[in-house]
């Protein structure tokens, strides 16, 4: 599916984006609040818990977050949604992918998801990076109220990206 990309750069249209996958996750905030009550920030239990699904950048950011529960829930939901957007037989285990990506804010405060290729390489999943993630990006939306936080991820590629099966078809037809 090709989606027109209406953002303009100067007077040039940036082209189209192709949706490769979508994912969403919903977190019940009282559950996260209770979890963090039992594992307060700075404790060994919290460090072990965060190390299971947070990138080093997120672990550092968690210590300074004004609202720990919202921060942790936002990171968790974003990664669950990302995993659903890239799900497939060749995907690495969820925990590996969770530790290899990180949620951060862009220059104007919008949430973004980045993938650390070095983390995937150290975990032995460079092929997944090369075939499924390189040349793509993740669009992230996070919303919350008192009791719930939801994250939506759209995995997109520009018109130059070729998935492995497309590269094989092009090679066979050449």
From Swiss-Prot:
Compartment(s) of residence: Mitochondrion
EC number: 2.7.8.7
Swiss-Prot/TrEMBL keywords: Fatty acid biosynthesis, Fatty acid metabolism, Lipid biosynthesis, Lipid metabolism, Mitochondrion, Transferase
Enzyme class, UniProt record, top EC level: transferase
Catalytic activity of the protein: apo-[ACP] + CoA = holo-[ACP] + adenosine 3',5'-bisphosphate + H(+)
GO BP terms in the entry: fatty acid biosynthetic process
Gene Ontology terms: cellular component: mitochondrion
Keyword Lipid biosynthesis in annotation: yes
Main subcellular localisation: mitochondrion
Keyword Transferase: yes
Any one GO molecular function term: holo-[acyl-carrier-protein] synthase activity
Family: Belongs to the P-Pant transferase superfamily. AcpS family.
Function, in words: Transfers the 4'-phosphopantetheine moiety from coenzyme A to a Ser of mitochondrial acyl-carrier-protein.
Protein name (Swiss-Prot/TrEMBL): Mitochondrial holo-[acyl-carrier-protein] synthase
Organism field: Eremothecium gossypii (strain ATCC 10895 / CBS 109.51 / FGSC 9923 / NRRL Y-1056)
